[in-house]
UniProtKB/Swiss-Prot annotation:
Binding-site residues for Mn(2+) 1, renumbered to this chain: 400, 404, 460
Family, similarity comment: Belongs to the BPG-independent phosphoglycerate mutase family.
Keyword Manganese appears in the UniProt entry: yes
Gene Ontology terms: biological process: glucose catabolic process; glycolytic process
Keyword annotations from UniProtKB, A to Z: Glycolysis, Isomerase, Manganese, Metal-binding
GO annotation, cellular component aspect: cytosol
PANTHER family cross-referenced by the UniProt entry: 2,3-BISPHOSPHOGLYCERATE-INDEPENDENT PHOSPHOGLYCERATE MUTASE
Molecular function via GO: manganese ion binding; phosphoglycerate mutase activity
Binding site for substrate: 123, 153-154, 185, 191, 260-263, 333
Self-association state and partner proteins as the record states: Monomer.
Source organism: Clostridium acetobutylicum (strain ATCC 824 / DSM 792 / JCM 1419 / IAM 19013 / LMG 5710 / NBRC 13948 / NRRL B-527 / VKM B-1787 / 2291 / W)
Official protein name in the record: 2,3-bisphosphoglycerate-independent phosphoglycerate mutase
Cofactor binding annotation: Binds 2 manganese ions per subunit.
Function: Catalyzes the interconversion of 2-phosphoglycerate and 3-phosphoglycerate.
Length: 510
């Protein structure tokens, strides 16, 4: 009997907002999405804050969104867990963090704190850096240096000076700590194996080579003078009397305070891994601690907050029922539909096929807002002809990745591209008598300007996301409002399966 696939289509960064100004989703011509939204059962889902296990009012993000969708339950995020540990004091007893601190006390060496200097809460949080500085102060560490990666994506594009001033004020207040380097996240947090970028960040932190400035603020000013916003600040070494204030050396300790793994892996490998071939470098003999587990295979790295074991995810449960599934996305979101969707497990489930389409090699995605959506679509249509899959999880990266550029016209084009692909895929699935659930993991493209100052906005939003059910059998079916964790139970109901008890989400079908 021919398969009737149940598909989840995640339009990354496609939120819902009534505001028209700066709304690329509203401005785009999207006849297919509009047709489905207006003629099929639909609702809105919470994709930020408490709805996805983040602090109240915290914008959602792709990692968190896919974790919640795949788990079928609200997954309390690293941001929330670490913040709570600081508040209740457990943070200061953490074994891995104390190991790093004790190493510098024993060797009279230096403690380096590196990570994204941002209150954005997507990859890191400034308060966690303050917690580490507090720990170092409590333990009488004498030499502490910060290697600040600058954001400009999850916060306004030119806001770094505010966060630098905040952390410098804090360090002055406690009498400990100094910024040693600054690097835009474009260089220090690449995730696409562009080692030539990471090498510049590495050279600044380890070799003391790169752009030079007398202070972090002056480094940012120089970058703004060259029309480079925070994300693109060239790795810069802070110098005093012509010498770097600090570099990472043998016997030092490094704590990487980013909690989100995907953009933290490459620079970790460059500094800490024994077997590394991204670029030529000498391996350091250091104590390296990561805030969370970036990759289970990393050797010589200690983890402060280990992974939560999430069992019976949607993928695992469907696999155990003997059904076939496909995960498909382009490079930028491949980890999201695989690793994050599976609850932080790298290994595919039994009968889980994966299709990875390369993202285009462009400096920024406004230069190619179509990204690889057409190639993803072609591959998916080909796979659907195989009559193999019971469940398909698909991600279109465009509304998010192009939304991050802050360029409205490009984001509009991104949404239009995805809509065109959406039409082809839904037509195909309906011909197979399958069903499609259309949703997003968080908002982005629906707000491309900061309403407080009229400037471009590159960050995610706290807006709800759509949830649309398209099938040949939608009569009398209605959908309740809910959260991302309710998607998996809804899909299981559509597949005629009971949800496992671990899934605390509820089916959205009334």
């Amino acid at each position: 009997m021919a398969k009737k696939p149940v598909m989840l289509m995640i339009l990354d960064g496609f939120g819902i907002s009534d505001k028209v100004d700066g709304n690329a989703v509203k401005a785009a011509s999207k006849p297919n999405f509009d047709k489905y939204f207006n003629n099929y059962p639909h609702t809105h889902l919470g994709a930020s804050g408490l709805s996805v296990g983040l602090p109240d009012g915290q914008m959602g993000n792709s990692e968190v969104g896919h974790l919640n969708i795949g788990a079928g339950r609200i997954v309390y995020q690293s941001l929330t867990k670490i913040t709570k540990a600081i508040e209740d004091g457990d943070f200061f007893k953490n074994a891995a963090l104390n190991k790093a601190v004790n190493n510098v006390l024993e060797n009279d060496s230096t403690l380096h704190l590196m990570g994204l200097l941002s209150p954005g809460g997507v990859h890191s949080h400034t308060n966690h850096l303050k917690g580490l500085l507090q720990l170092a102060k409590k333990k009488n560490v004498k030499k502490v240096f910060v290697h600040a990666f600058l954001d400009g994506r999850d916060v306004p594009p030119s806001s770094a000076k505010e966060f630098i001033k905040d952390i410098e004020d804090y360090m002055n207040e406690i009498g400990l700590g100094e910024i040693a380097t600054v690097s835009g996240r474009y260089y220090a947090m690449d995730r696409d194996n562009r080692w030539e970028r990471e090498e510049l960040a590495y050279n600044a932190m380890v070799l003391g080579k790169g752009e030079e400035a007398e202070s972090a603020i002056k480094a940012v000013d120089a970058s703004y003078h060259d029309n480079k916003t925070d994300e693109f600040v060239l790795p810069t070494v802070i110098v005093k009397e012509g010498k770097p204030v600090a570099t990472i050396k043998d016997k030092d300790s490094v704590i990487f305070f980013n909690f989100r793994p995907d953009r933290a892996r490459q620079i970790t490998r460059a500094i800490a891994e024994e077997a590394f071939d991204g670029f030529k470098r000498d391996r350091l003999n250091i104590e390296f601690v990561t805030m969370t587990e970036y990759d289970a295979s990393f050797k010589g790295v200690d983890v402060a907050f280990g992974p939560e074991n999430i069992t019976n995810t949607l993928g695992e449960y469907v696999s155990n029922k003997g059904l076939n599934q496909l995960r498909i996305a382009e490079t930028e979101k491949y980890a999201h539909v695989t690793f994050f969707f599976n609850g932080g497990v790298e290994e595919p489930n039994k009968n889980e096929d994966r299709a990875l389409i390369s993202s285009p090699k462009v400096a920024t995605y406004d230069l190619k807002p179509e990204m690889s959506a057409y190639e993803v679509t072609d591959e998916l249509l080909k796979r659907l002809d195989e009559d193999k899959y019971d469940m398909v999880i698909l991600n279109f990266a465009n509304p998010d990745m192009v939304g991050h550029t802050g360029i409205l016209e490009a984001a509009k084009k991104a949404v239009e591209t995805v809509d065109e692909c959406l039409g082809k895929i839904v037509d195909k699935v309906l011909k197979l008598d399958g069903s499609v659930f259309i949703t997003a993991d968080h908002g982005n493209s629906e707000q491309m300007i900061d309403y407080s100052n009229g400037k471009p906005m590159t960050a995610h939003t706290v807006n709800p996301v759509p949830f649309v059910y398209v099938s040949n059998h939608t009569e009398a079916k209605k959908l309740n409002e809910g959260v991302l964790a309710d998607i998996a139970p809804t899909m299981l109901q559509e597949m005629g399966l009971e949800k496992p008890e671990e899934m605390t989400g509820k089916s959205l079908f009334e």
